[in-house]
């Protein structure tokens, strides 16, 4: 169980496939669940018994096409201090999210044109130290500007002012993304004001 302990300490979760790569058979995982040492989180995914679930990892685990966006990305990037009450994910148009929605009922899905999906994807750490994919600050700002009428005004204002006051902002990418995503005029208005 030493290899497994180290893996779980680093990653938090393990899949059947990952366990097999480490030389741990599936029946051994089932045995550890039965003994109360592991907990089955979902089909083929296990964690140490008693560990706190990192819901962001659970949502994105084995879902390569899931990227956290909108409110969730703003929170992960430090542009919002409000913990989202539902997780906002973006997927390419045509991607089937039924398996995710079946497990989690607090998901808001945004379907993105395939040609725009990969723009601004980065990897960030969750509060638990696990890595997940989300859109960068510039893409997130473009996204919320495009959906500003559907957003909570305070979250929107905090994110916009937080971005323009941020030392890590990349104005070149902001303009580039805004042009591709069709919100350049709106972005330029905010740039003039802030």
Report each predicted region and the residues it spans.
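A short, conserved structural fragment
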Residues: 36-43
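Short amphipathic alpha-helical interaction segments
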Residues: 21-34
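Conserved short "hinge" loops at termini or chain/domain junctions
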Residues: 10, 15-17, 22, 42
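Short amphipathic alpha-helical interface segments
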Residues: 1-13
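Nucleic-acid-binding surface
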Residues: 14-17, 33, 47-194
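TRNA-binding/sensing appendages of the translation machinery
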Residues: 2, 16, 27
């Amino acid at each position: 169980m030493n290899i497994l302990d180290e893996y779980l300490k680093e990653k938090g979760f393990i899949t059947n496939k990952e366990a097999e790569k480490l030389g741990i058979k599936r029946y051994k995982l089932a045995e550890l669940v039965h003994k109360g040492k592991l907990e089955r989180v979902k089909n083929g995914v296990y964690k140490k018994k008693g560990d706190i679930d990192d819901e962001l990892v659970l949502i994105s685990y084995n879902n390569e096409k899931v990227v956290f966006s909108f409110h969730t990305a703003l929170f992960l990037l430090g542009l919002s201090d409000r913990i989202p009450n539902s997780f906002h994910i973006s997927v390419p148009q045509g991607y089937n999210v039924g398996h995710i929605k079946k497990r989690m009922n607090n998901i808001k899905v945004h379907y993105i044109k395939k040609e725009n999906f990969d723009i601004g994807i980065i990897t960030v750490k969750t509060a638990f130290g696990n890595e997940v994919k989300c859109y960068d600050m510039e893409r997130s700002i473009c996204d919320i500007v495009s959906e500003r009428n559907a957003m909570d005004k305070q979250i929107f204002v905090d994110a916009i002012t937080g971005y323009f006051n941020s030392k890590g902002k990349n104005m070149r990418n902001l303009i580039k993304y805004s042009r591709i995503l069709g919100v350049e005029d709106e972005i330029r208005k905010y740039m003039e004001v802030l």
